[in-house]
Amino acid sequence: MALTKHRRTLEAAAVVANLAFTFLYVNDSLWSYAFGILGPALLLALCIRERFYAEPLLQVVYILMTVYGWIHAQSSPWIASALWHVIAIPVCILVAVGAAYFLRRTAARYPLQDCLVTVFGIFATWLMMNQDPAWAWYFLFINALCVWMYYRRSLYLGTAMYVLYFAMALDQVAHLSIFSA
C-alpha cells in the first residue's frame, strides 16, 4: 500500500507530538499538556482516515483527560485499590466486546482490538492523570496491541511510536528511569 505524502506527514506530526507529551509527562513538565492536546488531535484525524472507528473516541478522551490532568497537576495522587482493578478489568473487557459487536457491522478495521485499546486506554489514562502508577501496567497491554494494529495498517511511524511507548511503560513498571529523570 503506497503511503500518500499527507498521510506520512500527519502520522509523523502525531508521533512527534505524542512522544513529546509522554517524555515530558514522565519528567513532570507542565509543557507536556500542550503536546497532550496536539498529539491526540493529530492521531484522531489519522485514525478516522484509516478506519479505526473506536480509537478516535480514545483520542478525544485523551484530550479531555489532558485538560483534566493540567487542571489537577498540583493535586495529590489518587491510587486505586486492588478492588478497583478487579472490577475494572472485566468491565473494560465487557464494554470493549459489546462495542466491537456493533463495530463489526461497519468497515472498521480490527474492531475488537480497536475497542480493547479504546476502553482500556480510557481507564489507563484516567489512572495516569490521577498519578496512579498502575497506569503503566495497562499501557503495556494497550501499546502491544497498538503495535500490532498499526503495523497491520502499514503505519510504520505509528508502530515505532507504540514500540517506544511500550518501552516507556516497561520503564515505569520496572523503575528503570531510562526515560525519566
Walk through the language-model features, giving the residues of each.
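Juxtamembrane boundary at the C-terminal end of a transmembrane helix
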Residues: 170-181
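N-terminal membrane topogenic signal
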Residues: 1-13
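Intrinsic, low-complexity N-terminal interaction/targeting segments
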Residues: 7, 107-128, 132, 136
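Hydrophobic, membrane-inserted alpha-helices
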Residues: 14-21, 38-44, 118-125, 140-147
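Short, hydrophobic transmembrane alpha-helix segments
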Residues: 23-31, 46-50
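Hydrophobic core of alpha-helical transmembrane segments in multi-pass integral membrane proteins
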Residues: 20, 85-103
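Cytoplasmic-side transmembrane-helix entry/capping segments in multi-pass membrane proteins
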Residues: 55-63, 82-87, 109-119
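Alpha-helical membrane segments and adjacent membrane-interface helices in multi-pass membrane proteins
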Residues: 37-73
